[in-house]
Amino acid sequence: MNLLHWSSPELTLTFALDDGPVRLIGVREASRPDSEDLVPSQPLVEVSATGHGLSPSTNRHVDTTLGQQLRYVRHEETGATLRIIQDDPSTGLRVTSVFEARAGVRAWSEASIAGPGTLELTFLSSLVVGLPSVDAELHSAANSWMAENRWSVRSLRSETLADIVSDAHHHVARSRHPVTNAGSWSTGEHLPVGVLIDRSTPYALGWQIEHNGPWHYEIGESRDGGYLLLSGPTDQEHQWSVELTADTPFSTVPVSLVAGTDRDSVFAALTRQRRAIRHRRPVDDRAPVVFNDYMNTLLGDPTTEKLLPLIDAAAEVGADYFCIDAGWYADGDWWNTVGAWQPSATRFPNGLAEVIDRIHSHGMVPGLWLEPEVIGVRSPIAHELPDDAFLTRRGVRVAESGRYLLDLRSTAARAHLDQTVDRLVREFGIGFFKFDNNTMTGPGTDKGGTSLGHGLLEHQRALLRWLDDLQTRHPDLLIENCASGAMRMDYAMLARLHLQSTSDQEDPLLYAPITAAAPAAVLPEQAGHWAYPISGSTREEFTFALVNGIPGRLYLSGHLNRMTPTELDLIRSALAAHRAILDDLDTLVPAWPLGLPTWTDDWIALSLNGPDISYLTVWHRTPGPSTVTLSLPRSRIDPHFPTEDTAWTYTWTDDTLTITANTPEPSARVLRLTRS
């Protein structure tokens, strides 16, 4: 067997270059030896087209006839990039598999066709990995509004990939475990992230799909092992197809791949990979504490009268940025009238500039909430912009929840958004935008004669280009990625943007598992967690709400101007604790001593680990005293927040930490662990 070994700093890939299709038969940590159980069973590329389907016919995206017909032509190594080129002589199809060495590996497929013919693709994988076995546990996450990052673990063999005891005279099992997300909310139902842990060896594989629209992955069984298939939109799941000609090639969405020995080592590797693919700008180094007036505070009803005392109070506790959230652009009900983004004269009788100037006067940077991709059906802008500026189906504008949706392929749509952002930056010195997205597109647009799914793919890619151009024009601008909380929490967006809203959840007790699980999907230095203490609540309730924000990017809200001096001192202490973690945050990797949290866990723990120091955040969500044990390297414990605490006790027995919460109500703590 002719083998090709190729490595990134942390990962080694092994390909079989034999007489059949190229196969990716090994994915391992670069520091680990070659496996002796390489199984060259699954082609590297799976591709379907009209007239070229599957054999046997199933719902799976493997066993494609075109994938089986591809043959190795050559490979090219240039710097940190590997390109493996395969052709199908019968159709003229050429597929190039591209691999970029980052921390792990980033990969995608490029398809083209030679000659005068055409080929209508209905599926093209970004990457397919051959697995030695499907006797494995899958860690994956459901994601929905106010209930984000809900991780679970399942045994593939016992739950979805039943062992049918196939022999040589029968086909292999045709079942699969599919995970799919549809529409423009890339994380509206599921996260595009997974970890597969082998049940018999210390081996684990992790991945993420980096697209801000539809995606699909599936795991299934082959005759002598299994496969992991990663892709963007498909015809079967998303109404996607595209016509290849000699002049119109196609590239899939990128994916990332890492490996480790267990769950936490893989999530640590994914964390390093996310840092490696991020387009970090000098302004990202600021990592400011942002106060936002929305959550459990003004709730979309800002006025000069309400904002000025909040601004003064936010400055007093030490916020760096002050973001005015929804409502600043409308006198009353605004949902289906948005689009002009002009300040309301009713809310701000002396102009929005009076409020913005107060923010500037305290040395804070002003921010505004904006929902750039929608135009309300009752907005004057809906009549000023041409139909070409909007997503359409059969010539009719797509309308969802009282909004039209801009098509960012359109010059008119981009010009409208450019003029809006440039005006707000120029007139008010805006340095921060919270870009929200509360309306889904459905399957897409057929404008230009494309399939619905391909029209959506082109729009989502145009959105990314618009964001890139915007940040090039405004290099000091920070942008928060929000879509009804975290409904678009993907690394097409987050490779570019500064901050991710992790939820719209209003209950601190329910925010705890969201905060704790977030680093499995997003970098801790990008995870914007609401901390919204409520004046008049008990000290433990107040503390709990603040703890939620500390192990990430604390996103402050609450009626600070109504709080007592004691409450404000506790907020200052929380911000000091948070800033101490910020000094190290972009080097720390996550681990979960009690496992990834479920939605109903009483005890939850997140550890952010460095070489010598860890920050351990622990939540106890039920009333009354309780005790929990954690397996951790024995370390010195210092209370990090709150710094003065006698209600929780800590006892080491070898490498087991016993924590007792002696409180009559739910409580939470952040600890600093120093290894000797």
Each model region followed by its residue ranges:
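Polysaccharide-binding surfaces and accessory modules of carbohydrate-active proteins
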Residues: N2-E221, H238, P642-Y650, I659
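Hydrophobic faces of well-ordered beta-strands that scaffold small-molecule active sites
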Residues: V289-D293, I324, P366-L370, F433-F435, ...
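Active-site-proximal substrate-binding groove within the catalytic cores of carbohydrate-active enzymes
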Residues: L463-L673
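Conserved, mostly hydrophobic/aromatic
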Residues: E10, S109, D247, F291, ...
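Aromatic- and glycine-enriched glycan-recognition loops and surfaces
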Residues: D293, T297-H383, A415-Q419, E458-Q471
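Active-site groove signature of glycoside hydrolases
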Residues: D320-W328, H416-G449
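Active-site-adjacent "subsite" loops/lids of carbohydrate-active enzymes
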Residues: P288, L299-D301, A345, P372-R423, ...
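Short Pro-Gly-centered flexible turn/kink motifs
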Residues: V242-T261, L616, E665-L673
